[in-house]
């Protein structure tokens, strides 16, 4: 049975969890099978910046980092569920969240 794979990325964990809960609510409302949310490892991007060059050639570095939280949700395909997901304002226009949808045909949920 084909299914829809939703990958969600965000730097804000609370916003990510809110979107995941909204997706779970829509799926529960329509009654289709769902697997997930599966938390993926957090990606940490580090940027070292030379703050000052100290006395006698010593260097002082600052390190800035950004954490990217990721989740995967698999949903059995249903026209009604997909329409509800696409029309939900929380899903369609997030500011800090990126969402990827992928239709997979040959795998069982």
From Swiss-Prot:
Query: Taxonomically, which superkingdom?
Result: Archaea
What's in the keyword line of the UniProt record? Ribonucleoprotein, Ribosomal protein
Q: Name one GO molecular function term.
A: tRNA binding
SMART domains the record matches: Ribosomal_S10
Q: One GO cellular component term, please give it.
A: small ribosomal subunit
The answer to whether keyword Ribonucleoprotein applies is: yes
Q: Where are the transmembrane segments?
A: none
One GO term of the biological process aspect = translation
Q: What does this protein do?
A: Involved in the binding of tRNA to the ribosomes.
Name the family the entry cites: Belongs to the universal ribosomal protein uS10 family.
Quaternary structure (record): Part of the 30S ribosomal subunit.
Q: What is the protein's given name?
A: Small ribosomal subunit protein uS10
Q: Which organism is it from?
A: Nanoarchaeum equitans (strain Kin4-M)
The gene designation is rps10
């Amino acid at each position: 049975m084909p299914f829809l794979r939703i990958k969600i990325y965000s730097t804000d964990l609370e916003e990510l969890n809110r979107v995941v809960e909204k997706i779970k609510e829509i799926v529960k409302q329509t009654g289709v099978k769902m697997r997930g949310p599966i938390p993926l490892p957090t990606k940490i991007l580090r940027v070292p910046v030379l703050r000052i060059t100290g006395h006698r050639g010593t260097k002082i570095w600052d390190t800035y980092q950004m954490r990217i939280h990721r989740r995967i949700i698999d949903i059995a395909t249903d026209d009604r569920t997909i329409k509800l997901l696409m029309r939900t304002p929380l899903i369609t226009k997030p500011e800090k969240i990126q969402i990827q949808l992928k239709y997979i045909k040959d795998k069982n949920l």
